[in-house]
């Protein structure tokens, strides 16, 4: 997708090492819109594709082409070869005609309606087409003119996608301090995110992460007592300071549903285990305090299932023992209900030899409103039987899903897939593997290796962004 374009011409991510390419073979994926001053300056763009038509896969399926006019320094959308020839031209048109065409493009192809996007089919049909495009196409689409750029950069296109049931899930994870990568499991492409800004204390501290809406939140400590949040925005491809919680904490359980997320439990800067819960709205960037849970807990996990939020397991009580119960929060009634034995059982070896604090929080994920768990000790996958309220073993984890007491192993829902990210260390520094299973047939897990990546360490943090 616009492979030859210079990274300086727009905010971009770096696409690297899919299973079909060597890790040293890099190209550019342009998913982020340029600022107006860059697009409307006196000079040409960094790339001047003279008289060339570029088609991304999803645009080609819809019959549209992205056309670059070297004279007007702008893009337009074409619905066929005749329009492409007319837009590119033969170089004989006057400068006045070229300027008129540039203004025409800035108005979305309609000099009478500045909001029509694709004039031939109207705004509503234009949007109906655009929400079906891949997320990776939106950088190119945003480069067409101001109207397309506003649609993408404002986040409106993602809200419309969500409302109409079009969601792509990408996996974001960190295996190096302050460095994050994204992985598209469908196209099997890697994207490098900008390096996080932070203090030395935050860089070396334990961090927690969650993707909500078009944001990736990374939470940690900036000094020994101050909790901070850094927010990565998909819309700008940049990091910024996020809004602090009403009751800052760490070691909480969290999950997101569309543009909202719930953070439950955790402990404060003095180590007190909390029963607090808060809801975050990524579009408004606001925190709302929710009713308190029935039990204080830390090192717990959170999921959304059947439209309700669940906090699972963790450590609580006066003696800081492991909790086997969970709690359900109903967003309509705003009430918590305790559920016995919702936490997946620990293996016998873990129960005998390990304190609860040494083990990672429950590795749980929800696919199609079914709750799954990874048992890192027995290397098994379990499924929660809602009717009988018990856990059943359904099969094995991937062979190379190594971890240290569950730490360093990512077990996530990614749309209709379960994703497992982990791997053993080796003398050359180590590598991680990404395995996927779509639990649709009710049979045991059949894992598909999506890709592997060299890594000096295991997975520190992992989140899945669906938008």
UniProtKB/Swiss-Prot annotation:
Residues 116-163 form the F-box domain. SMART domains: Kelch. Kelch repeats lie at residues 159-210, 215-259, 261-307, 308-356, 365-411. Residues 77-117 are annotated as: Disordered. Coiled coil: none annotated. It comes from the Eukaryota. GO terms for biological process: protein ubiquitination. Residues 92-111 have a biased composition (Low complexity). Pathway: Protein modification; protein ubiquitination. It is found in: Nucleus. InterPro entries: F-box/Kelch-repeat (IPR052439), Kelch-typ_b-propeller (IPR015915), Kelch_1 (IPR006652). Its main location: nucleus. GO terms for cellular component: nucleus. Keywords: Kelch repeat, Nucleus, Repeat, Ubl conjugation pathway. Component of SCF(ASK-cullin-F-box) E3 ubiquitin ligase complexes, which may mediate the ubiquitination and subsequent proteasomal degradation of target proteins. The F-box is necessary for the interaction with ASK proteins. Part of a SCF (ASK-cullin-F-box) protein ligase complex. Interacts with SKP1A/ASK1 and SPK1B/ASK2. This is F-box/kelch-repeat protein SKIP11. It comes from Arabidopsis thaliana (Mouse-ear cress).
């Amino acid at each position: 997708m616009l492979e030859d374009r210079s990274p300086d011409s727009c905010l971009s991510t770096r696409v690297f090492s899919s299973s079909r390419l060597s890790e040293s073979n890099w190209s550019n994926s342009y998913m982020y819109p340029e600022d107006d001053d860059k697009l409307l300056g006196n000079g040409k763009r960094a790339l001047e594709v003279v008289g060339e038509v570029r088609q991304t896969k999803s645009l080609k399926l819809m019959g549209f082409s992205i056309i670059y006019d070297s004279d007007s320094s702008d893009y337009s959308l074409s619905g066929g070869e005749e329009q492409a020839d007319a837009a590119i031209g033969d170089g004989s048109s006057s400068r006045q005609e070229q300027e008129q065409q540039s203004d025409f493009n800035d108005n979305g192809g309609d000099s009478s309606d500045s909001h029509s996007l694709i004039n031939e089919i109207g705004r509503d049909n234009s949007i109906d087409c655009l929400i079906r495009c891949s997320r990776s196409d939106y950088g190119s689409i945003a480069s067409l003119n101001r109207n397309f750029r506003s649609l993408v950069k404002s986040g409106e296109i993602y809200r419309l996608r969500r409302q109409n049931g079009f969601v792509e899930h990408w996996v974001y994870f960190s295996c190096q301090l302050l460095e994050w990568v994204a992985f598209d499991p469908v196209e099997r492409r890697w994207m490098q995110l900008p390096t996080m800004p932070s203090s030395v204390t935050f860089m070396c501290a334990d961090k927690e992460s969650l993707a909500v809406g078009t944001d990736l939140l990374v939470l940690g400590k900036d000094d020994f007592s101050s909790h901070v949040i850094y927010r990565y925005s998909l819309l700008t491809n940049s990091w910024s300071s996020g809004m602090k919680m009403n009751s800052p904490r760490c070691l909480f359980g969290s999950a997101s549903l569309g543009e909202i997320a719930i953070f439950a439990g955790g402990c404060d800067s003095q180590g007190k285990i909390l029963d607090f819960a808060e809801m975050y709205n990524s579009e408004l960037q606001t925190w709302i305090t929710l009713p308190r849970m029935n039990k204080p807990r830390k090192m717990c996990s959170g999921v959304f299932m059947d439209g309700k939020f669940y906090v699972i397991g963790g450590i609580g009580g006066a003696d800081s023992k492991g909790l086997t119960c969970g709690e359900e929060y109903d967003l309509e009634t705003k009430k918590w209900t305790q559920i016995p034995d919702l936490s997946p059982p620990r293996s016998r070896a873990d129960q005998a030899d390990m304190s609860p604090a040494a083990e990672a929080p429950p590795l749980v994920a929800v696919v199609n409103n079914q709750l799954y768990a990874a048992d890192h000790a027995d290397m098994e996958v379990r499924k929660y039987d809602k009717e009988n309220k018990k856990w059943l073993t359904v099969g094995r984890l991937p062979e190379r899903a190594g971890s240290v007491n569950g730490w360093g192993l990512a077990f996530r829902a990614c749309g209709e897939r379960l994703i497992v990210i982990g791997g053993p260390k080796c003398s050359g520094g180590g590598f991680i593997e990404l395995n996927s299973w779509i639990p649709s047939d009710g049979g045991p897990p059949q894992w598909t290796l999506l890709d592997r990546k060299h890594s000096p360490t295991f997975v520190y943090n992992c989140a899945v962004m669906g938008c």
